[in-house]
Curated annotation (Swiss-Prot):
Pfam families (UniProt xref): Asparaginase_2 (PF01112)
Similarity comment: family membership: Belongs to the Ntn-hydrolase family.
GO cellular component, as recorded: lysosome
Reaction(s) the record says it catalyses: N(4)-(beta-N-acetyl-D-glucosaminyl)-L-asparagine + H2O = N-acetyl-beta-D-glucosaminylamine + L-aspartate + H(+)
Name of the protein this chain belongs to: Putative N(4)-(beta-N-acetylglucosaminyl)-L-asparaginase GD10667
Length: 393
């Protein structure tokens, strides 16, 4: 009898505990998007309700490329939501910069390589599907960002490069034409007249510091690598490493990010920078937000700063801290690089960080500036060791 009584009491105890647990689960508040992003709710509620607040829709891009931003904003405002409109906004905005040859570092007629040729890199990323279309080393085709879109929409690939990318563009209806202009030719001739200085070679002979080559490898003891690297360092600056990176978000939180550039001036032919690399030049995820980068692509692409920024926001960091963290990872290894990063969460909050420049300008269009929906923002940069200046808006 006592054995049966004890068993019955034990069953009742277990049932009571189970009921209590279920009640707690059913009555616990679900994490909201705000608490997820502030890191207060454990697992991020990445599929929270949509917002139609004052921050959206929005377009944001690197540098003071105003015309590109204005066009993208106009396209986005005309939309009723949907993936196509954010894509249209980014592609047409970047295309505008290509046509205007923004700072001679986007589009045709700028940044000639060692042979005097201009080649183009571009990328489009869809934050809903995580699909990417990109081109690198594109030759004789002016519309790099539009070709990247065709890679996204008409192939199962992520990136096409070089002459094969140009052949693909021809098949898609794009015409071949020279990307060299009198200005870019003069730029190249002046460079060659000055013994091809500066350049991107190291550990070769003849000495790349005083000669145009052709070069051959020079065996170098490992202990001398840092010395040679410092001696042959190419001075990176805005006028030879600009990229337009653009993010568009509509009121339904659909996100696209895109980039376009003609790369590093006087680059070794075949060089590809960070702009067309997913996670480096740009990254977008509808569940979190997006980021775009600009600067020394050869260094930045090794660290995937745009991906780092998006993942930091996924973990709860605000955009400004996420951008800062993306650059700090680079600074652990490269104290002398130049770069900037913009991060935006899916609700339209944004921040920027920069290093190695006096300041970094970027364009923003959103309802948040009712009297000035399209506006230029700037962030002061600090060139000191392991210091990154940030702006949170």
């Amino acid at each position: 009898m006592r054995t049966h009584l004890r068993a019955s009491l034990w069953v009742l105890c277990l049932a009571s505990m189970a009921f209590s647990i279920l009640a707690a689960v059913n009555t616990s508040p679900k994490p909201t998007l705000a608490s997820a992003f502030s890191g207060k709710a454990g697992t991020p509620a990445v599929k929270a309700n949509k917002t139609t607040g004052e921050l959206l829709p929005m377009v944001i891009n690197t540098w003071n490329f105003t015309a590109a931003n204005v066009l993208a904003w106009r396209i986005l405002k005309q939309s009723k939501g949907g993936l196509r409109q954010t894509r249209n906004a980014v592609v047409e905005g970047c295309s505008k910069c290509e046509k205007l040859q923004c700072d001679r570092t986007v589009g045709y007629g700028g940044s000639p390589d060692e042979l005097g040729e201009t080649t183009l890199d571009a990328m489009v990323m869809d934050g809903a599907t995580m699909d990417v279309g990109a081109v690198a080393g594109l030759r004789r085709i002016k519309d790099a960002i539009k070709v990247a879109r065709h890679v996204l929409e008409h192939t199962q690939h992520t990136m096409l490069v070089g002459d094969a990318a140009s052949a693909f563009a021809n098949a898609m209806g794009f015409e071949s034409e020279s990307l060299v202009t009198p200005e870019s030719k003069d730029m190249w001739l002046q460079w060659t007249a000055e013994n091809c200085q500066p350049n991107f070679w190291k550990n070769v002979h003849p000495d790349p510091k005083v000669s145009c080559g052709p070069y051959k490898p020079r065996p170098t003891p490992l202990t001398r690598w840092k010395e040679d690297r410092a001696r042959n360092e190419y001075e990176i600056g805005r006028k030879n490493h600009d990229t337009i990176g653009m993010i568009a978000i509509d009121v339904e939180n659909n996100i696209h990010a895109g980039t376009s550039t003609n790369g590093a001036r006087h680059k070794i032919p075949g060089r590809v920078g960070d702009s067309p690399i997913p996670g480096a030049g740009a990254y977008a995820d509808n569940e979190v937000g997006a980021a775009v980068a600009t600067g020394d692509g050869d260094v930045m692409m090794r660290f995937l700063p745009s991906l780092l920024a998006v993942e930091a926001m996924r973990a709860g960091k605000p955009p400004a801290e996420a951008a800062q963290g993306g650059l700090r990872r680079i600074l652990k290894h490269h104290k002398d690089f130049m770069g900037a990063l913009i991060a935006v969460d899916r609700l339209g909050n944004y921040g920027a960080a920069c290093y190695g420049l006096e300041e970094f300008p970027f364009m923003v269009s959103s309802p948040a500036g009712a009297d000035r929906p399209t506006r230029l923002e700037t962030v002061k940069c600090i060139a000191g060791q392991d210091k990154v200046n940030i702006v949170a808006l």
